[in-house]
Amino acid sequence: MDCYTANWNPLGDSAFYRKYELYSMDWDLKEELRDCLVAAAPYGGPIALLRNPWRKEKAASVRPVLDIYSASGMPLASLLWKSGPVVSLGWSAEEELLCVQEDGAVLVYGLHGDFRRHFSMGNEVLQNRVLDARIFHTEFGSGVAILTGAHRFTLSANVGDLKLRRMPEVPGLQSAPSCWTVLCQDRVAHILLAVGPDLYLLDHAACSAVTPPGLAPGVSSFLQMAVSFTYRHLALFTDTGYIWMGTASLKEKLCEFNCNIRAPPKQMVWCSRPRSKERAVVVAWERRLMVVGDAPESIQFVLDEDSYLVPELDGVRIFSRSTHEFLHEVPAASEEIFKIASMAPGALLLEAQKEYEKESQKADEYLREIQELGQLTQAVQQCIEAAGHEHQPDMQKSLLRAASFGKCFLDRFPPDSFVHMCQDLRVLNAVRDYHIGIPLTYSQYKQLTIQVLLDRLVLRRLYPLAIQICEYLRLPEVQGVSRILAHWACYKVQQKDVSDEDVARAINQKLGDTPGVSYSDIAARAYGCGRTELAIKLLEYEPRSGEQVPLLLKMKRSKLALSKAIESGDTDLVFTVLLHLKNELNRGDFFMTLRNQPMALSLYRQFCKHQELETLKDLYNQDDNHQELGSFHIRASYAAEERIEGRVAALQTAADAFYKAKNEFAAKATEDQMRLLRLQRRLEDELGGQFLDLSLHDTVTTLILGGHNKRAEQLARDFRIPDKRLWWLKLTALADLEDWEELEKFSKSKKSPIGYLPFVEICMKQHNKYEAKKYASRVGPEQKVKALLLVGDVAQAADVAIEHRNEAELSLVLSHCTGATDGATADKIQRARAQAQKK
């Protein structure tokens, strides 16, 4: 363990800092880092280098090359820069490279050098040019702050939702500030800048002068400033060689350190660990690296090469042409276990496990000592926590073996923390591999979350590793494997050197019916890449027609979209396509398309019946559908025409259509309707009252009710109403009028073609038994019993039934007998039945 702590450096009495190598860089740089614009993304992100050809000592004719590497120096992309001079580079939270040009344009590139988009920082920036720029990160996203040639600041807090803010002017500012940075306080971005010995804070409304509390006297200029990773702390480097450290609000001083170097540093960044009370700043010059904090002494390292600092959540990454290192505060658990002469529970447990492997009795002694103090649970937890903060797998295994050894002597130690740590370390070791090049620490991994890490693997097109991690962690398919396969498929469709057929087959073989994968999304990506035929092939695998059809319409494959909509059976989907086709095609082509799709034609007719009647008529005309055309004119005659002449004309057109359709019945019926309308109009003129639009039967009934019997009979003859129907109409009308005398005359006018039982029924319906009895005697023998029962003459009905010897009539009469009044009648029927059975 003494050897293990050889690279530990104390800062004061309470903290140690260590620097270890992440990778040996093999990126074959042709330029020194000082001659390049450099940007490195946090959380073990990629590195972008752009050699600066716009420097005066360089040849202006040489075009710069933008190179993108992984953190291990593996090349990811290289492209010749063909745009304007670049002032600053920076990475967004989504690992998109933002290139801020001198003219205020910001070009956005993907991790593999693919151009994504561009935006401008405004006309004022374009006119005054860009002197300096900062890319910063907030809870809203990634922002850009610009210092223009007019010494004004413009910023946007979120490049994904660009809203430019012009900051207030600094009074009397005639030259560029000596240093400046972006602060994020209360969810608002501010600019802090130094002008000589003065500091100014710019917000959206005002410019205010601020003074750091407890600043050493004699400061005439601020040379460098740095804000911490979480924007909570601020460090200021003065021309006196003092480094002031305090809160970002400039209300509280943490400490001040005299580094005895007045030369401005190349970089200054914070180096702090989450939940740690220690605060330290790392300052870099050409060949010196210094770690300073709240201690009288500093930690100093010699830099053999030109280096670049990348602030992280829990430390600082330092890379040069040959190495990539990580500097951080030693975590508390590691310090407790590994510091010299430590008697911490975790240290004793680690020793006990090592002695156990040697089969030494000292293992039992160490273990008993921990158990006697009651600290075995604490020892296991310390070893588990320390394993997470170790970079070397061998040391991770040693600590986890110690934790596992200690767990064996605990009855109820929850295994979750141990299992999760093993899983997390396996994932971390996989992504830290040189060929992957994402040197995440455990703290960064937990802050980033597994979902974001998977997204970054997908962004690097490391699909197999991402899928293996999902399967190992047993993530739900929708969040894990399915999502990654969908990304893989979207990348696959961009490979234009492979045929559409092969790409579609490969995607289907890999994806199959994987839940959570949308073939329509993949097809949309293929269409966006200009591969329409591939998109159509992919849509064949999409089971949801509601996802197929919109994209087919977007691709101008409307007829195919119509076929798919019809196959789905979703009428709303069919209507959507039909309305799209109607706007896209001319009228003739639209109708021809409908003729080839009967279901679509039927649905469109239904639509037209409610919305576009004239279009419906055109459809019938084009199809020579005279039958439906006739029906259309009949409906139109009643719906649209109010004048009798117009209605008759529409009916005449309908009759002609029916004759063309060889439907003589409909044609004759239409002509009869025309005659009836003319007659009704004449009756209204001659008799008054309301006749128009009545049916033939209602017209006859109305005439009878009005006492115009002769006209009713003439109407019946003209329209050949059968006698039975006419008698029913007249019988009903006279009964409604309660004109019993006229009804009796009518019944005696000639023999009734409907018999006399209807007379009985109608009279009883009007509650007139007296009149009903008049007609009951005239009812024929076969209906006599029913008529007598209707008028309530049960006894006579029984006599008739006995006389007819009809079992059904006897049963009918018997059902009308009541015990109190018709007992004798019931006995009479029973005796008649008995006699009939004897015979």
Swiss-Prot record:
Keyword Ligase: no
Free-text tissue specificity from the UniProt record: Ubiquitous.
Keywords: Autophagy, Cytoplasmic vesicle, Disease variant, Dystonia, Endosome, Lysosome, Membrane, Nitration, Protein transport, Transport
GO BP of this protein: autophagosome maturation; endosomal transport; endosomal vesicle fusion; endosome to lysosome transport; intracellular protein transport; regulation of SNARE complex assembly; vacuole fusion, non-autophagic
A single GO molecular function term of this UniProt record: actin binding
Quaternary state and interactors: Core component of at least two putative endosomal tethering complexes, the homotypic fusion and vacuole protein sorting (HOPS) complex and the class C core vacuole/endosome tethering (CORVET) complex. Their common core is composed of the class C Vps proteins VPS11, VPS16, VPS18 and VPS33A, which in HOPS further associates with VPS39 and VPS41 and in CORVET with VPS8 and TGFBRAP1. Interacts with RAB5C. Interacts with STX17, MON1B. Associates with adapter protein complex 3 (AP-3) and clathrin:AP-3 complexes.
Protein name: Vacuolar protein sorting-associated protein 16 homolog
Taxonomic lineage from the root: Eukaryota, Metazoa, Chordata, Craniata, Vertebrata
